UniProtKB/Swiss-Prot annotation:
This is Homeobox-leucine zipper protein HOX33. GO terms for cellular component: nucleus. Residues 168-390 form the START domain. It comes from Oryza sativa subsp. indica (Rice). It is found in: Nucleus. It comes from the Eukaryota. Probable transcription factor.
Length: 855
């Protein structure tokens, strides 16, 4: 027994039944295994942690070394082994959480120390102000800078404009002096009180939170600060942060002009960066900066950056036409290693975007530190956390692809849309001739392969015939529409604004023989859209998906041409409860193969809230106080409306790209201009419909709508039925004979109305109609006519559709329809008639399903 126990492992039996393997049993309680036996069992455990009874018996036969152990004992060994593995994982998880909590506790203690210093400074300034107020004579005679009442604010806003002698790239000592000054100023912002930071609402620390986010208050330019924990080593974090185009979506390019090593092991880089313009109404920005990377004595890594200007000294950077030079004030990243692995990151972004150079209505985009925080500071932290999460292996692969592939797709969609909005000449874009009065800008690119890139497969259209890319874009202001709500509606209700013919043209551009010009195929209609999710970010603020548009047609030719179409779509900023710099919906047609190197031609929408600047000086706050006293609709003050998260104004940017053949360029341009104008009108109509002021607390309840539009529609339905059939609708209840809407609502037969569009969507239903569709008035607009009809119903409608349009009505045979929940319902007969408005113009199509019942 002693020989069997040497180097072995003891396993407690689940029962005390006697066993024949006496050498492995210790007092009937433990079974001891030799190292060779444990090694054999571990090999099997690696292959199959939970073997079946047959597998365990086979194991005993295959391994003679296990022949003296009963199958029941081996079963107990595997049970205990699984328990040990589970305990090991749980212990590891708890250790990780404990390390995070310890690091977060250290972070909070440092934040507390910094806030205490800030409070002490404010108390001192407050006491000084009181002294000045009680001694006005001293305030008038003392002309020193400390006598200014707003000394604290003055101190914050004043940038020391110390003129240094001109220092160029040939003088490393001069650049090192600038770098050391930048490092000191950055550290005073990251861990000191050089900037008065105000924590953003909703950003609370915790082991799984993104970190502590704060924005500047009363300082020159706009600034944002973040500190958080990530499970990556400092060198990896630094590598990610330096690759700015991978996480900063507004970054067009970063060119490192010159690299100078320093004596302390660091590096100085001279960098030229270009950023995209957020809308078509503003010019893009560029930056000429010095970036300094160095290590600190405590093992931390610092990457700091600032613009090289006349006041700082240093060489002059490149000047690019059509760009406005903006300034980076001392900013950067402080990366500290954590005990047990991981890093603690401090991020400071401080810029002056020259807000006075843009139209006044757009200045909030350049004056809001919250927008800067969302676009840069939080984006950097989220990207690092996303990569750390992917590196842990906890994210399952979707569609057979690694997460990095989906990140690349998202970056390509976003970058392609930004390229379309900005239309840089060095990418091949040029303006098409216009009379100057157009609200829609048309640009063409005759070098599409340069724009698409050499890393993707060439488009067959560009390789077979001469052609290019045409972009139609526009921007407009919206009132009282939350960007998240609008973009979510555009995503979920594509049929409300999209033209199936244009979608078909875009999809055909992926094939060698595209349609000539869309606009002629209007009799067919597009079926429902199916959303196939692909990937999403860690906090679900952005997601990638494939949209399948099911194609159908009425005529024989359209059936041959129609086919399912696919869009790769990127959606972000649609959570109304989260703070976001913008809401965006970008999509590009793809084919069924969905190759990694497929060319993408993105189009889409971007909605940016125009929030008023909340961090201005005291004079601005006085104006804000006055405006807060203004009472808006419903008796609510404007301040209370803004505090509730409602966006009063936003700017919408639309850009649609189309490929074209050279001889059809003018035709495609006319189509694109007309289409974008129609989309803008649809979006404006949707914005009015979904504005919060129009959404009451009763929305979604099944009750007859009492709006004037509903009353008018009810009278049109009854009058049109009488005009076409020569008889009135047989009302099941005459109690409300004076109210056509009430009669229509209470009718026992299902009465449904759908739009006269290529893709008919339901616009109205009575109570019975909502019952048969198993939906509500709000969700009714999600349902298309195509979705509820079976094959026989579609054939009957297609054959009778010309009769409806000519004679005004028709009777359809009984059949079966499908509810939104997938349940089938039968009806004895259906009546379809054309609803005419007061001027006898076709308004919609009405259906009455007689004597319906669920099957």
């Amino acid at each position: 027994m002693a020989a069997a126990a040497v180097g072995g492992r003891g396993e407690r039996l689940s029962s005390s039944s006697p066993t024949a393997a006496a050498p492995q049993v210790d007092a009937g309680k433990y079974v001891r295994y030799t190292p060779e036996q444990v090694e054999a069992l571990e090999r099997v455990y690696t292959e199959c942690p939970k073997p079946s009874s047959l597998r365990r018996q086979q194991l005993i036969r295959e391994c003679p070394i296990l022949s003296n152990i009963e199958p029941k004992q081996i079963k107990v060994w595997f049970q205990n082994r699984r328990c040990r593995e589970k305990q090991r994982k749980e212990a590891s998880r708890l250790q990780t959480v404990n390390r995070k909590l310890n690091a977060m506790n250290k972070l909070l203690m440092e934040e507390n120390d910094r806030l205490q210093k800030q409070v002490s400074r404010l108390v001192y300034e407050n006491g000084y102000m009181r002294t000045q107020l009680h001694n006005p004579s001293a305030a008038t005679t003392d002309t020193s800078c400390e006598s200014v009442v707003t000394s604290g604010q003055h101190h914050q806003q004043q940038n020391p404009a110390v003129l240094h002698p001109q220092r160029d790239a040939n003088n490393p000592a001069g650049l090192l002096a600038i770098a050391e000054e930048t490092l000191a100023e950055f550290m005073s912002k990251a861990t000191g009180t050089a900037v008065e930071w105000v924590q953003m609402v909703g950003m609370k620390p915790g082991p799984d939170s993104i970190g502590i986010i704060a924005v500047s208050h009363n300082c020159s330019g706009v600034a944002a600060r973040a500190c958080g924990l990530v499970s990556l080593e400092p060198t990896k974090v630094a590598e990610i942060l330096k690759d700015r185009p991978s996480w900063y979506r507004d970054c067009r390019c970063v060119d490192i002009i010159h690299v100078i090593p320093t004596g302390n092991g660091g590096t100085i880089e001279l960098i030229y960066m270009q950023t995209y313009a957020p809308t078509t109404l503003a010019a893009p920005r560029d930056f000429w900066t010095l970036r300094y990377t160095s290590g600190l004595e405590d093992g931390s890594l610092v990457i700091c950056e600032r613009s090289l200007t006349q006041s700082t000294g240093g060489p002059s950077g490149p000047n690019t036409p059509n760009f406005i030079r903006a300034e980076v004030l001392p900013s950067g990243y402080l990366i500290r290693p954590c005990e047990g692995g991981g890093s603690m990151i401090y991020i400071v972004d401080h810029v002056d975007l020259d807000a006075w150079s843009v139209p006044e209505v757009l200045r909030p985009l350049y004056e809001s530190p919250k927008i800067l925080a969302q676009k840069m500071t939080i984006a950097a932290l989220r990207h690092i956390r996303q990569i750390a999460h992917e590196s842990s292996g906890e994210i399952p692969y979707g569609a057979g692809r690694q997460p990095a592939v989906f990140r690349t797709f998202s970056q390509r969609l976003s970058r392609g849309f930004n390229d379309a909005v900005s239309g840089f000449p060095d990418d091949g874009w040029s303006l098409l001739s216009s009379d100057g009065s157009e609200d829609i800008t048309i640009s063409v690119n005759s070098s599409p392969n340069k724009l698409v890139g050499s890393h993707v497969s060439p488009n067959p259209l560009f390789s077979t015939v001469g052609g290019g890319i045409l972009c139609a874009k526009a921007s407009m202001l919206l009132q009282n529409v939350p960007p998240a709500l609008l973009v979510r509606f555009l995503r979920e209700h594509r049929s409300e604004w999209a033209d199936p013919g244009v979608d078909a043209y875009s999809a055909a551009s992926l094939r060698a023989s595209p349609y000539a010009v869309p606009g002629l195929r209007t009799s067919g209609f597009m079926g429902s859209q199916v959303i196939l999710p692909l990937a999403h970010t860690l906090e679900h603020e952005e997601f990638l998906e494939v949209i399948r548009l099911e194609g159908h047609g009425f005529s024989h030719d359209e059936v041959l041409l129609s086919r399912d179409m696919y869009l790769l779509q990127l959606c972000s900023g649609v959570d109304e409860n989260a703070t976001s710099a913008s809401a965006q919906l970008v999509f590009a047609p793809i084919d069924e193969s969905f190759a990694d190197d497929a060319p993408l031609l993105p189009s889409g929408f971007r909605v940016i809230p125009l929030d008023t600047k909340m961090d201005g000086p005291s004079a601005t706050r006085t104006l804000d106080l006055a405006s807060a006293l203004e009472v808006g609709p419903g008796g609510a003050s404007r301040a209370s409306v803004e505090a509730s998260g409602t966006c009063n104004r936003s700017v919408l940017t639309i850009a649609f790209q189309f490929s074209y053949e050279n001889h059809l360029r003018e035709s495609v341009a006319a189509m694109a201009r007309s289409y974008v104008r129609a989309v803008m009108a649809s979006v404006q109509r949707v914005a009015v419909a979904i504005a919060p002021s129009r959404l009451g607390p009763q929305i979604g309840m099944k009750h007859p709508p009492a709006s004037p539009e509903a009353l008018t529609l009810a009278s049109w339905i009854g009058r049109s039925y009488r005009a076409h059939t020569g008889a009135d609708i047989r009302w099941s209840d005459t109690e409300d004979a004076d109210s056509p809407l009430a009669l229509l609502w209470k009718h026992s037969d299902a009465i449904l109305c759908c739009s006269l569009k290529p893709a008919p969507m339901f616009t109205f239903a009575n109570n019975a109609g909502l019952d048969i569709l198993e939906t509500t008035l709000v969700n009714l607009q999600d349902i298309s006519l195509e979705m509820i009809l079976d094959d026989e119903g579609r054939k009957a409608l297609c054959s009778e559709f010309p009769k409806i349009m000519q004679q005004g009505f028709t009777y359809l045979p009984g059949g079966v329809c499908k509810s939104s929940m997938g349940r089938q319902a039968s009806y004895e007969q259906a009546v379809a008639w054309k609803v005419l408005s007061d001027d006898d113009a076709p308004h919609c199509l009405a259906f009455m399903l007689v004597n319906w019942t669920f099957m």
